[in-house]
Amino acid sequence: MSRNRRFATVEKSYITDIERERCKKVAAAYAELYELESILVLDVGRYGFVKLQYYTPEYGFNDVITYTDSESMFEDLWQEWLDTRLYLFAKGTPMLEMGYEEIFKCLPEEKQKELLEQKAVFAKMAEIELK
């Protein structure tokens, strides 16, 4: 048997070109999140996009989540952004012991509205239609 055999490799793509472009817009819309939290979103070619989170020098990233559709990526990054904002609001207070929902309920109504309206801002930046 010859050792010079050629193997045909077929590269399967797990994300469509359209979704790749949409995901790029979502990743760009949430750029401020990457500065606030130890999160990095990367285009990994035919595999889609990955969110790397919770970095430690000894072990690298604890969480790696792969996205192949822009809507789930948008919703996940929205929740990360909101949770980060709520954490920052509660930091240094007894509220930090509460869950994110409870922290949100403790906020003044105007602040709640302001936070929720930010989702529409991100959606517009990412060219995503909210449902």
Per-region residue spans from a language model:
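Negatively charged, low-complexity tracts enriched in Asp/Glu with abundant Ser/Thr
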Residues: M1-I39, F122-I128
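Acidic, low-complexity, intrinsically disordered interaction modules
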Residues: V41-F122
